[in-house]
Amino acid sequence: MVSEIFDPDAWESVTDEFDDITYHRGVDAPVVRIAFDRPEVRNAFRPGTVDELYAALDHARKQADVGCVLLTGNGPAESDGGWAFCAGGDQSVRGDSGYEYRDDDEAGDEDDPLVREARAGRLHILEVQRLIRFMPKPVVAVVPGWAVGGGHSLHVVCDLTLASEEHAKFLQTDPDVGSFDGGFGSAYLAKQIGQKKAREVFFRGKTYSAAEAADMGMVNEAVPHEELEAVARKWAEEMTAKSPTAMRMLKYAFNMADDGMVGQQVFAGEATRLAYMTEEAQEGRDAFLEKRDPAFEEYPWHY
C-alpha cells in the first residue's frame, strides 16, 4: 500500500528505484505525485531522502507533458496510525555540521575521500527548496498530517497548500533543536501571513490546525481527510488545463517581487525565450548568419 488515501487506479509508478519516496504519474492527467515514504518517523528526511526528492522533482521539471507536481507524505504509520507530510530533518542522523549519510546509504559508499568529506554534513534540503521555487510549473503541498520544522518550510515554499481538516498540523520547531530557516521558511512565510504572525509561528513553537493555517493564509484550503488527494488532483487538473506558457510566466512573475535580481533574471530569461520565438527575432538571427543588415523596418513599434 502506498498510502491509505492513495487511489491506485489514478496513478502509475514512474520508478521503484527509490527507498525513501514514491513517485507516480497520473494515468490520464499531466500530473505527478511525489511522496515522502518514511511514515514511521513522520516522513522525516535524511540525506538520501533529499537526494531522491531532488532527483524526482528535477525529472518532473524536465517532462514537457507534466504540468503540475503534488508533493505529499504517505501514511499512516503502522505503529500508531499517525499521519505526516514531513517532520523535517531526521535528528538521529544530524551531525555537528549537518545531516550525515550512514554507511548503508547509497552516497555513503562514495570512494572519493574528498567527496565523502564534503558530504560529511548536508543541508541540501535548501537545494530542494530552490528547485521547487524555480520549477516552471505549480508545485502543490498536499499535507495529510504533521508539517514540522524543515517540513513546514517545504510547504511554505510550494505554490499552493491543501491540508487535511482532521490530521494536518503545522508546527515550527527550528529554535527547539538549534536550527533556523533564515530564507524561504521564515522570510517568505512572513510575506504570506505577515511579520507578526510569522514571528509567532517560529518564536512560540505553537501547533496550528489546518483551519487555523487557512485562516492566517499559509494554507489555501482545509479539506476532509478522505477527500484530500482527490481534491488535490482536481486542482492539478484545473491548472494543467491552462496555457503552459502563461502559467510559467505567472509563477515567475509572482516570484519576482520577492526574489530580487535572481527573480528578475529568471523572469527575464523566460521573456527572452518568448522573444526568440517571434519572426522579428528570427530575422535578426538570419541577418547575422547571412551577413546582411536586418530588415527590422517591417516590424511595428508596439505601444
Model-derived segments and spans:
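A general structural signal for well-ordered alpha-helical segments in protein cores
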Residues: I125, S186, Q195-A198, M247-L250, ...
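Short loop-to-helix capping motifs
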Residues: R38-P39, K242-S243, K291
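Interdomain hinge/lid region at the active-site interface
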Residues: G269, M277-A281, A287
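Hydrophobic/aromatic residues within transmembrane alpha-helices
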Residues: I34, L71, D90, L154-V156, ...
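Crotonase-fold acyl-CoA enzyme core
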Residues: R130-P244, T278
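C-terminal long alpha-helix characteristic of the crotonase
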Residues: D80, A163-A168, V219-V266, R273, ...
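Conserved CoA-thioester-binding segment of acyl-CoA-metabolizing enzymes
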Residues: M1-S79
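Glycine- (often His-adjacent) and acidic-residue-rich active-site loop
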Residues: V41, G73-V128, D176-G178
